[in-house]
Swiss-Prot record:
Binds 1 FAD. Binds 1 FMN. Its cofactor is FAD; FMN; heme. It comes from Acremonium egyptiacum. The gene is ascE. This is Bifunctional cytochrome P450/NADPH--P450 reductase ascE. Residues 504-644 form the Flavodoxin-like domain.
């Protein structure tokens, strides 16, 4: 005789809808269990469901010969999005069986292991983000872990980068998904007629968000279909496209592929982000657990990179993860039903005690089941990782821990989630300490289809031994740990006289002008600490490195090579005998671009190593900055304050290191004078190359000054003027008359003109960077200059959130002064905060063979909405300046040599060339081709030339299309386009790397069977993509899958036959 299953009495038509809070359903259902016991019944969504909350009952339901998974409730509503996907199909639906057979291998142990590097890449982005934001930044824990896990599943499973950490807002898929999950939960407890008729507005919005999710999935599939060779690994997407049932040979339809793409994006990141969020809640509220977990990482990993080999050895962290999932299974319910084909119309559970009708849903409440005191004891609600160590975990009663589901319908991505969770936890504990943003925070549960902590925020602080300048190198095993200098030293007074200044030499290498500007700023800061610094190029110091004073070196690395004014110095230094610099005291600061991993900071590190080899004594740890962060000047200042000045014993000073200029403003006249650092060229023509509405790209022809020479591939350095609109803003702020004249006293440590009059207009237009983002020191100085408490507090907040509020928004000193009128600084003080105007470099787009007296440039005009939120336009300083030049105008220029190999080959008859570019990266190759035109007209039989060009549309921004077409007809070059917005006109290729892969036989023949030289010019993203596809062609040609072999071959190729020019 069976017993009646208890439960609260419902209302007509709507049943028990009012008994369940859709916003907090899991907690609500658990409370009902507390009232009605381990089994109860509710009428929800138009049907009666049974809810269980004991280990004994779920153990019975886990018998797959009697029961199977039932898709119901919110999960059934999710079928509106992904139909009969692997996650949402009923067990007897053919689509589930087919997808399961095809996709199981894609989640096997070897496949998951092969995803480690991509997981590590995404995890490193999170680590670097938290490091850069600093300990004052408030971290939305669930939000950032959601970005992490979404990007990881997208990259690992479908080779797609959502780049969530580089966007302020969530990816559209995530925002739509959250809306859909929330509404699916609400729809699950409402009768169908209520959903369809009463909530029509919600239904319309629901369908719109579903359409967004499906569109994104369709775009991913379409991209892969259009470029099937773009991804050579057998990722999940390729498995869905190419996989077949081993027995029937049947594959997944596009519709089924889209369904499963969506469900993997949902299930593959929602549950794991919740797990990590709950874990860090417990780590932060249990210091003893945190200490043990961090100690395990320190002892196992140390300061090296976390590797795949560490994953199986993080036993305590694994226990923490298990215990977290016990208390908070992020997929909090499993719904069962009697197995299809079961003969009886009904069955029983509970030892025959409770009757279950055919197809009736039985919901296992995992939060309650996994806290069953019969299994876990009286402390079942406490977080105790020790109960989840391997030996104890393996001896637990069957089916008492089921966060990944049951049997054959269990989570197919369990191994993926586990590896990802172990990796990110280890990396975060290795590098950070954490604290709650609100010390009084009490755990809140936020529920959609899964559960996460609600309103959970924390702070992350780099551990004492972690050097933020070398963090990224450490993550990837490319840098050694830097030392930490403690304790301030007494500083020099600003009142130091010229006679009291100690000597210092600052040596720099610079082609773009950035490091030169940094060297000048360091000299100004040095004066405030008692040093009179001499600033020189590195080449000028050959055989002249002083031994009686500190020597500070500031240098970049250009694709692993020294800048042009440091080449001789590097050669000289490498040839020195050991101990040749025995009495030299030095320190090095380097600039680099992290996109070039193999050559990142090569020259600064080489300089440091060679000085040490030659017996010099290092003053302070080498500083390494990354220009891609966009805050290189603030990083440089931070290195000075944290490393250089404390090591020299002048950590602090009585005043500001950036001495204010005692400028006398003469309002009576306008004797204007402009200092010229380069020779004057004359504009012959200036034309727009793109159609209206497209990003503006231009082409200018310049008559060079007499005697100025260049080679194809060289750069032209242009000294620009600030836009008059920006200059006018300064005049308005400073309340200067338009003909004001200023004088900077002679002897002031600056690169600006001193000891003579100069018009304020000329000074502001041509000598200082008005749009450069403010530095941290600028903010502190501005705050100290305001008598207004509100302004001081506001500026303090800006400084606390510097990366997000200043650097990312590119707020200049002028922007801040306009926003906070209470700041009271002089015009001279304002000028002292600004770095000097620096030249910008552009690849020359012509050949001197055609006309040695002229040079042409091709560039994109930067004109976009300002990140500051001011409503103004952000105008690129030099690109805007060049765009405004007209015939007859004069512009200050100088030639800068390209990298040694970035020129047409000296033996063009025997060496083919392959050129790849995106956008205005075409510039140097136009020069190459113009040179070939001249050579062919001279009767030379040249080796083949191939040009791969990436742009948007053949009619709107295919630059110099007619000229190139004529050259192709003349046999000068064979051109292969990739149109991102018209790929049907470029063999289905959207990007230059796609076209290279499409023509890989040509590239293979040139690089492997011939002696072609490969040139690449474009942005860092395109450069990396082209590099990757060339390596892929190598692996495809050799039949090798080893990344190390491809990397070794590629490094050899770069020595002589692969050359790149990357622009910002």
């Amino acid at each position: 005789m069976t017993e009646l299953i208890p439960g609260p009495k419902g209302l007509p038509l709507i049943g028990n809808v009012l008994d369940i809070d859709p916003v907090d359903a899991v907690v609500c259902l658990g409370r009902i269990a507390d009232t009605y016991g381990h089994i109860y019944q509710l009428k929800v969504g138009g049907s009666a469901k049974i809810f269980i909350s004991s280990r004994e009952l779920v153990d019975e339901l886990s018998d797959e010969s009697r029961f199977t998974k039932l898709v119901s409730g919110p999960l059934a509503q999710l079928r509106n999005v992904c139909h009969d996907s692997l996650f949402t199909a009923q067990s007897d639906e053919p689509a589930w069986d087919l997808a399961h057979k095809i996709l199981m291998p894609a989640f096997g142990p070897l496949a998951i292991r092969g995803m480690f590097d991509e997981m590590h890449d995404i995890a490193s982005q999170l680590v670097v983000k938290w490091a850069r934001f600093g300990p004052q930044d408030t971290i939305d824990v669930s939000g950032d872990f959601t970005r992490l896990t979404l990007d990881a599943i997208a990259l690992c499973s479908m080779s797609t980068r959502f780049n969530s950490f580089y966007k302020q807002d969530q990816h559209p898929f995530v925002s739509s998904m959250l809306e859909v999950l929330a509404e699916s939960g609400k729809r699950a407890v409402r009768p169908p007629f209520v959903n369809d008729y009463i909530f029509r507005g919600s239904l319309k919005h629901y369908n719109t968000e579903i359409a967004t999710m499906r569109r994104i999935a369709m775009d991913v599939l379409a991209e892969r279909r259009a470029n099937p060779m773009a991804c050579q690994k057998n990722d999940l997407l390729n498995a869905m496209i190419n996989g077949r049932d081993p027995k029937t040979g049947e594959g997944l339809s596009d519709e089924s592929t889209i369904n499963n793409l969506i469900v993997f994006l949902i299930a593959g990141h929602e549950t794991t982000s919740g797990l990590l969020s709950f874990l860090f809640y417990y780590l932060l509220t249990r210091p003893d657990v945190f200490e043990k977990a961090q100690k395990e990482v320190d002892e196992l990993v140390g300061r090296g990179p976390v590797t795949i080999e560490h994953m199986s050895k993080l036993h305590y962290i694994e226990a923490c993860l298990r215990e977290t999932l016990r208390l908070h299974p992020t997929a909090p319910v499993i719904t069962f039903k009697t197995k299809p084909g079961f003969e009886k119309e009904s069955t029983t559970i509970g030892g025959g005690k409770y009757k279950i009708d055919r197809d009736q849903g039985i919901v296992a409440l995992l939060v309650n089941i996994q806290r069953d005191p019969k299994v876990w004891g009286d402390d079942a609600n406490e977080f105790k990782p020790e109960r989840m160590t391997d030996e104890k975990f393996n001896n637990l009663p069957a089916n008492c821990w089921k966060p990944f589901g049951n049997g054959i319908r269990g989570c197919i991505g369990r191994a993926f989630a586990w590896q990802e969770s172990l990796l990110i936890t280890a990396m975060l504990l290795q590098n950070f300490n954490f604290q709650l943003a609100d010390p009084d925070y009490k755990l809140q549960i936020k529920q959609t289809l899964t559960i996460k902590p609600g309103n959970f925020f924390m702070h992350a602080k780099l551990r004492d031994h972690v050097d933020p300048l070398e963090l990224e190198g450490i993550l990837h095993g490319g840098a050694k740990k830097g030392s930490k200098i403690d304790g301030p030293s007494s500083g020099a007074s600003l009142a130091t006289t010229e006679q009291e200044l100690q000597p210092m030499t600052i040596l720099y290498g610079s082609d773009s002008g950035t490091c030169e500007s940094m060297a000048q700023s360091l000299a100004r800061a040095a004066r405030g600490r008692g040093y009179g610094a001499t600033v020189k190029t590195l080449d000028s110091a050959v055989e002249q490195v002083p031994k009686d004073q500190p020597v500070v070196i500031v240098s970049p690395s250009y694709n692993g090579q020294p800048p042009s004014n440091a080449t001789d110095f590097v050669k000289w230094l490498e040839a020195l005998d050991s101990k040749a610099l025995k009495d030299v005291k030095y320190s090095v600061y380097g600039c680099g671009n992290k996109d070039y991993t193999s050559t990142f900071h090569r020259i600064p590190k080489l300089l440091d190593a060679e000085f040490e080899r030659c017996g010099a004594k290092r003053i302070a740890e080498t500083g390494l900055g990354d220009v891609t962060v966009g805050d290189i000047f603030s990083d440089f200042e931070r290195w000075q304050d944290d490393q250089l000045w404390p090591a020299l014993g002048v950590a602090h000073m009585d005043g500001d290191a950036d001495a204010e200029f005692d400028i006398h403003v003469d309002r009576s006249g306008r004797a204007a004078e402009l200092e010229v650092d380069a020779d004057e060229a004359t504009v012959q023509s200036n034309q727009v190359l793109t159609a209206p509405g497209e990003p503006e790209k231009r082409y200018i022809t310049l008559k060079l000054p007499e005697g100025m020479q260049y080679k194809s591939g060289d750069h032209l350095s242009v000294l620009p003027l600030n836009d008059w609109g920006v200059v006018r803003r300064v005049f308005a702020w400073a309340q200067l008359p338009w003909d004001a004249v200023v004088t900077i006293p002679k002897g002031t440590n600056t690169s600006l003109p001193t000891g003579r009059q100069i018009s304020a207009k000329d000074l502001l237009s041509g000598y200082v960077e008005l749009s450069q983002p403010a530095t941290r020191k600028n903010i502190a100085k501005l705050a100290a200059s305001s008598p207004c408490p509100f302004t001081q507090k506001s500026l303090s907040k800006l400084e606390e959130h510097f990366d997000s509020d200043i650097a990312q928004r590119r707020l200049s000193v002028l922007d801040i002064l306009e926003e906070f009128p209470a700041i009271d600084i002089t015009f001279g003080n304002f000028i002292s905060m600004l770095p000097p105007m620096r030249p910008r470099q552009y690849s020359i787009a012509s050949s001197p063979m055609a006309d040695p007296s002229t040079a042409t440039l091709m560039w994109t005009v930067l004109n976009s909405e300002a990140y500051s939120g001011s409503g103004r336009r952000f105008l690129g300083v030099c690109s805007t300046y060049l765009a405004g030049l007209a015939e007859g105008d004069r512009v200050h220029v100088t030639v800068k040599p390209a990298l040694r190999l970035f020129h047409p080959p000296s033996d063009p008859e025997s060496m083919p060339i392959i050129m790849a570019c995106a956008g205005t990266g075409l510039a140097p190759f136009r020069g190459f081709l113009e040179e070939r035109v001249c050579q062919m007209k001279a009767g030379r039989a040249l080796a083949p030339a191939y040009l791969f060009v990436g742009c948007r549309d053949p009619e709107k921004d295919a630059l110099l299309k007619d000229e190139l077409a004529q050259w192709e007809r003349d046999g000068v070059v064979k051109i292969y386009y990739a149109f991102s917005r018209a790929s049907d006109q470029s063999d289905g290729c959207k990007h230059v790397q796609d076209r290279i892969w499409n023509e890989r036989d040509l590239v293979r023949k040139g690089l492997f069977e011939g002696n072609a030289r490969f040139f690449m010019c474009g942005g860092s993203g395109a450069g990396k993509s082209v590099e990757d596809v060339v390596k892929r062609i190598y692996k495809d040609n050799k039949g090798e899958s080893q990344e190390k072999a491809a990397e070794s071959w590629f490094q050899d190729l770069k020595a002589n036959r692969y050359v790149t020019e990357i622009f910002a």
